[in-house]
Amino acid sequence: MGYKEGSAKKGATLFKTRCAQCHTTEAGGPHKVGPNLHGVINRHSGEAEGYSYSDANKRKGIEWTTEHLFEYLENPKKYIPGTKMAFGGLKKPKDRNDLITWMVENC
């Protein structure tokens, strides 16, 4: 099972409660513990300008499509061993779909 469009409204709540403490999304916004996510959809892994990524993220060599994000957000450390991301993941496919739908519209 892969990405299916979800609820952007529910995704906004998930972003605020699970992601915003480490990430910003506005154009030109600062990096925090994690990189600014503006423009992340279809960007290559490890390429947000000015952010210090782990070698693992740089080497992953993927484009952040909705499908890759769906897999990654389930278990970031399994998808990219060596990532600095300390987030344990969203186990429910519905939550990942909602968050990614919001990201497509807002990042």
Swiss-Prot record:
PANTHER family (UniProt xref): CYTOCHROME C
Mod. after translation: Binds 1 heme c group covalently per subunit.
GO molecular function: electron transfer activity; heme binding; metal ion binding
Keyword Mitochondrion attached: yes
Main location (coarse class): mitochondrion
Gene3D superfamilies: Cytochrome c-like domain (1.10.760.10)
Pfam families from the UniProt entry: Cytochrom_C
Cellular component, GO, one term: mitochondrial intermembrane space
A single GO BP: mitochondrial electron transport, ubiquinol to cytochrome c
The keyword Signal is annotated on this UniProt entry: no
Positions bound to heme c: C19, C22, H23, M85
Family listed: Belongs to the cytochrome c family.
InterPro entries the UniProt entry points to: Cyt_c-like_dom, Cyt_c-like_dom_sf, Cyt_c_1A/1B
Species of provenance: Yarrowia lipolytica (strain CLIB 122 / E 150)
Residues that bear N6,N6,N6-trimethyllysine: K77
Cellular compartments annotated: Mitochondrion intermembrane space
Keyword line: Electron transport, Heme, Iron, Metal-binding, Methylation, Mitochondrion, Respiratory chain, Transport
Protein name, as recorded: Cytochrome c
Primary role: Electron carrier protein. The oxidized form of the cytochrome c heme group can accept an electron from the heme group of the cytochrome c1 subunit of cytochrome reductase. Cytochrome c then transfers this electron to the cytochrome oxidase complex, the final protein carrier in the mitochondrial electron-transport chain.
Superkingdom of origin: Eukaryota
